[in-house]
C-alpha cells in the first residue's frame, strides 16, 4: 500500500469547470446546421460525462482497499480520518460517476432524436445541468477526500 500515489483530488467546481471547458472545444464540421448541432451536442454530452467520470473513477481506484491492507495501516487510517467516513466518501464518488454516465446514456438518444438545433441545445443544456447537480451533491464527500489525502 502506498498512500503517496493517491492523485490530487479536484474540488467540485474545478471538476465541473474542466469538463465544461473541454466540452466547449468540441465542434463538428458538417454543412447542415441541424445535423451539426445534433452531432456536436452528442459529442459534448459524452465529453462532459467522460471528463467528470474518469477523474472520479481514478480517485476511487487510487485509494487502497480496506479489506486487504495491513491492520496497522487500517488502524492509522481509522484514527486519522475514519475508515467508515472514507468508505462513504469513496462510495459517493463512485455513485456520482455511475450517475453521470447514466445521464449521458439517457440524453444522447434524446439529442440525436431532435430535429432542430434549438431543441438539441436545450437537451444538451438539460444534460449538463443534471450532471453538474450530481457532482455538486457530492461536494462534501470530495472535500473530505481532499482533506483525507
Language-model features: where?
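N-terminal accessory targeting/assembly segments
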Residues: 1-100
